[in-house]
From Swiss-Prot:
Compartment(s) of residence: Secreted
Annotated Pfam families: Toxin_20
Protein name: U-theraphotoxin-Lk2a
Recorded superkingdom: Eukaryota
Top-level taxonomy: Eukaryota, Metazoa, Ecdysozoa, Arthropoda, Chelicerata
Tissue specificity of this protein: Expressed by the venom gland.
Length: 49
């Protein structure tokens, strides 16, 4: 999986890693619904699974 920045500005394969405005504020997966396309919130980052 790949880690992305808090601002979601890293792009993988030409596409944003997660939607604009998506930020993980929790240390767990409570905000995972804000990350789409297989990305999940973990440790305040959106990770690709």
């Amino acid at each position: 999986f790949f880690e992305c920045t808090f601002e979601c500005d890293i792009k993988k394969e030409g596409k944003p890693c997660k939607p604009k405005g998506c930020k993980c504020k929790d240390k767990d997966n409570k905000d995972h619904k804000k990350c789409s396309g297989g990305w999940r919130c973990k440790l305040k980052l959106c990770l690709k699974f």
